From Swiss-Prot:
HAMAP family: Ribosomal_uS8_B. One of the primary rRNA binding proteins, it binds directly to 16S rRNA central domain where it helps coordinate assembly of the platform of the 30S subunit. PROSITE patterns: RIBOSOMAL_S8 (PS00053). Keywords: Chloroplast, Plastid, Ribonucleoprotein, Ribosomal protein, RNA-binding, rRNA-binding. This is Small ribosomal subunit protein uS8c. One of its GO terms (biological process) is translation. One of its GO terms (molecular function) is structural constituent of ribosome. It is found in: Plastid, Chloroplast. InterPro entries: Ribosomal_uS8, Ribosomal_uS8_CS, Ribosomal_uS8_sf. It comes from the Eukaryota. GO terms for cellular component: chloroplast; ribonucleoprotein complex; ribosome. The gene is rps8. It comes from Chara vulgaris (Common stonewort). Pfam families: Ribosomal_S8. SUPFAM superfamilies: Ribosomal protein S8.
Amino acid sequence: MSKDTISNMITSIRNGNLSKAKIVQIPATQTARSIAKILLDEGFIENFREVVISDKNYSLLTLTLKYQGRTREPYITTLRRISKPGLRSYSSYQDIPKVMGGMGIVILSTSQGIITDRQARQRRIGGEVLCYIW
């Protein structure tokens, strides 16, 4: 398992979507909670909850993935990690890219927490571009 929790989360969700899994479990971190809340608010996942394993002093986030139709096509088509530990990517609020002509979202890490591209433009703040989702 890698030390990059964001890449680990994105890879777990992508693998869950490819195998059409109902739930995905990832290690619970503050960053993972913030990203899961954004995914829930934007309608990309059905639900998430934190499961505390008391005997090991460890907690997991359980994400319930969302699918559409009888063919169970995932709502998340693509997840792409942008800023990596070896190559950080920052953007001012004017230069935040629009994903799929505004159909997708960009998740940014800012001084005001982890927020979407729309929230960053409204608040007029830039930050580190974490990932694209559509």
